């Protein structure tokens, strides 16, 4: 756990990690490289993050907060919360098509236990707020269990790069159809959500997220 005194060190390590992960990939980046380029001692790194997967969990937290923030801005406060979910997941999936090393980061995040649990638990809280009215009999725990399944769908699509037949637009339509049906969203509303996202410049929005 980082203290207030270690916050500048933590920030410096994270900045170095983002640069290295995007340039050469998560798996190819070693702890030795991170420590050297951050200018910190091995003990300082381990006190804050324990290991490289600790950095990944921290980055995942930042990325998800940023994605939901951008999604809320793109969806506007006037639209139902389901649109925020659609834009957030569209951003996430689009990011993996913009940068192969970013694809690796997300896939690793959905694979490593600590990072994956963070994703599922935090997403479940959002899902409960967004979809609770569609299935009022379900608890937040129920939505956590549903998220385990929808996260698996998300990971599957992220792991499969787009091609001439499976375009990004088609991938998003398929994901929305499956996930929103699981949350009991009416078919007509699913159609409206899909058309809304297709009307956005989702690649530009995702690039803005990546720059942050």
Place the predicted regions along the sequence by residue:
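Hydrophobic alpha-helical connector segments
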Residues: 58, 69-102, 122
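Short, hydrophobic secondary-structure boundary micro-motifs
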Residues: 103-108, 188-192
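Amphipathic alpha-helical packing segments from all-alpha helical-bundle domains
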Residues: 109-159, 170
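C-terminal peripheral helix-coil segments that are non-catalytic and often amphipathic
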Residues: 129-133, 159, 163-212
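Secondary-structure edge/capping motif, primarily at the C-terminal ends of alpha-helices
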Residues: 71-75, 103-106, 157-165
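Helix-turn-helix
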Residues: 12, 20-54, 58
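Hydrophobic/aromatic residues within well-ordered alpha-helical segments
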Residues: 59, 63, 67, 88, ...
């Amino acid at each position: 756990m980082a203290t207030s005194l270690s916050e500048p060190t933590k920030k410096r390590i994270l900045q170095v990690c983002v640069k290295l992960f995007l340039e050469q990939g998560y798996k190819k980046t070693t702890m030795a490289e991170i420590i050297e380029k951050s200018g910190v001692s091995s003990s300082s790194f381990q006190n804050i993050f324990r290991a490289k997967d600790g950095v990944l969990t921290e980055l995942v937290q930042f990325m998800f907060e940023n994605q939901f923030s951008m999604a809320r801005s793109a969806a506007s406060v006037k639209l139902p919360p389901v649109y925020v979910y659609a834009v957030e997941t569209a951003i996430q999936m689009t990011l993996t098509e913009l940068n192969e090393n970013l694809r690796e980061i997300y896939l690793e995040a959905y694979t490593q236990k600590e990072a994956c649990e963070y994703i599922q638990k935090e997403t479940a809280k959002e899902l409960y707020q967004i979809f609770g009215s569609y299935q009022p009999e379900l608890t937040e725990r129920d939505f956590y269990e549903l998220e385990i399944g929808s996260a698996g769908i998300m990971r599957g699509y992220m792991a499969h790069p787009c091609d001439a037949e499976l375009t990004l637009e088609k991938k998003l339509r398929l994901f929305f159809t499956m996930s929103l049906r699981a949350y009991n969203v009416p078919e007509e509303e699913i159609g409206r959500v899909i058309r809304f996202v297709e009307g956005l410049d989702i690649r530009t929005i995702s690039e803005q997220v990546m720059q942050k």
